[in-house]
Structure formats: C-alpha cells, structure tokens
Regions:
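Alpha/beta-hydrolase fold catalytic core
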Residues: 1-26, 48-51, 88-89, 178, ...
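Catalytic histidine-centered segment of alpha/beta-hydrolase-like enzymes
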Residues: 238-251
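Active-site loop/oxyanion-hole signature of alpha/beta-hydrolase fold enzymes
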Residues: 6-11, 15, 40-48, 52-98, ...
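Active-site glycine-rich loops that stabilize anionic/oxyanionic intermediates
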Residues: 31-34, 97
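The conserved beta1-alpha1 loop
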Residues: 29-31, 208
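Conserved serine/cysteine hydrolase catalytic core
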Residues: 181-225, 234
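Flexible "cap/lid" loop of the alpha/beta hydrolase fold
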Residues: 101-145
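Conserved alpha/beta-hydrolase catalytic His-Asp/Glu region
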Residues: 134-199
Length: 260
C-alpha cells in the first residue's frame, strides 16, 4: 500500500489484505537501515488471522521516499500520521531495535493512539559505539559489516537457518546496500541520542535474544525497571535479528501478547 504523507510516498505492507473497519490493527516498525521485510514472517501471519497489518517503510527506507527523519520523536510522529491518514484510531505497535524506540516514544507521547507495544531487541539507552557511528558517517562499507555481524548470533554463518533458502547475512547486506548515503548514520545517531519523554502506561512485551551482542538482555534492564508491569520473553538461541533467527519463537510471543 502506498499513501501520501507531506507530499511524499510512504509504503506499508498489508499482507495482501485491504484494511477493514472493525478489525484490530498492528503496526510493525523496522530497525536502523532496514525496511518492512524485516517482519515479513510475523506480519504475514497476523494479516491472515484477523488483523489489519501495516509493516512500514520509514522515510528514506525501502519504498518510502526520503529523506530519513533525524530523531526518534519525528519517526514516532510520522507513524501516528500514518494512522491518521488511514483512519486508524488505535493500534498495537511492534518495533525492532530502533523501531522499538519509536514504539516506546509513540506510547509515551501519543498514549491515546497506542493499545500495546512489543519491543523486540530493545536497549535503553541505545548508545551506538563511536567506530560504528564513524563508519556509517563516512559511508564506509565496514558499517554494513558491523551491522550484519553484530546483528546476528555467532552461530548464524555456520548454518542451521530456520528459514530454508534464506541467507541471513546476505539478506541484511542487500537491504543496507539499497540505502542512500547517510541513511544508516542518521538512524544510528537518532537511536543513540534518544531520551524517553514521559511514561508508558499501556501493556508492554519485551522480546530479547540471549545471544544478542548489539542489545543484550541486560541493556533492557533499566527500561524494564521504569515500566511496570511488563512481560518478558528471552529467546535462548537468538541474537539481535530475532524475526529471522527465531521466527517461530518471536511469533509465538507476539500471538500470546496480542491475543484478544
């Protein structure tokens, strides 16, 4: 689905289903440098099980026109604009990494629009290392390698992919190589600079990978302490890329959390 926001095209994957009034809505928000396809497996399930689905391409990513938005708050406001444009009063937000910060900020500042949030591979604060930021700033391909290697558990390149025919490293690199120069750096800086404003009152689910070296489970401890009550799922086998590394466990956690 393409919509027009501020004279720019924005794309949302809807699992090949038209949006229907009366159905609950779930919005999937990708991480830094990625696009809607990060949530391909999970979003498709909900689209075929009674939900309106919007798996978004943020501005400057995938099929949405740029430039990228420079702050998490601006991205959260943009997500709410999408809801406005589509006459969706309230939605569940599911975010991965940077997307989890967007969901978090939207829930804090636009509480009346957010029913629940699921935070996949979240850390707070989400400080990005200077070598990673610097490589992205220089549009150095080393930044893509850091994103890809740190973004998956160490066993991923050894095989055993739960999705037959999918090469996780290659898939990640292909998405990053499609980016315009500066987009990855903009995303990383926005994530690193983010400070939560306000409190979150809606139900919250944390889905964390035990083998995640980018946002290890302990890095969500401060945030979990600020949000009570919340639910927690830790996937022992997964690194940062939970949706691809552990698609079934991630989906099971979401299904249980979104059960109506």
């Amino acid at each position: 689905m393409e919509i027009l926001l501020q004279d720019k095209k924005a794309f949302a994957y809807t699992a090949a289903h038209a949006l229907e009034a009366g159905k609950p809505s779930v919005v999937f928000i990708h991480g830094a440098g990625l696009d809607h396809s990060s949530f391909a497996l999970q979003s498709r399930y909900f689209g075929y099980h009674g939900w309106n689905v919007l798996a978004l391409d943020l501005p400057g990513h995938g099929r949405s026109e740029g430039p990228p938005l420079a702050t998490i708050a601006a991205m959260a406001d943009w997500v709410v604009e999408v809801l406005d444009q589509l006459n969706i009063e309230k939605a569940v937000l599911v975010g991965h990494s940077m997307g989890s910060l967007i969901a978090l900020d939207a829930a804090a500042r636009h509480a009346q629009r957010v029913e629940k949030i699921a935070l996949v591979a979240v850390a707070y604060p989400m400080k990005v290392t200077e070598p990673f930021l610097d490589a992205a700033r220089r549009n150095d391909l080393a930044a893509f390698d850091m994103h890809t290697i740190w973004g998956h558990a160490a066993q991923v390149p050894l095989g055993g992919n739960p999705n037959p025919g999918m090469w996780m490293y290659g898939d990640n690199l292909a998405r990053l190589r499609r980016l315009a120069p500066g987009v990855l750096h903009s995303d990383l800086k926005a994530s690193s600079d983010f400070v939560l404003s306000g409190t979150v009152q809606c139900p919250v689910l944390f889905i964390l990978g035990k083998r995640d070296v980018m946002t290890p489970p302990r890095a969500a401890g401060e945030l979990r302490g600020k949000i009570s009550p919340s639910q927690l799922t830790v996937v022992d086998s997964s690194g940062h890329g939970l949706m691809g590394e552990a698609p079934d466990a991630t989906l099971d956690a979401l299904v249980a959390f979104l059960r109506r």
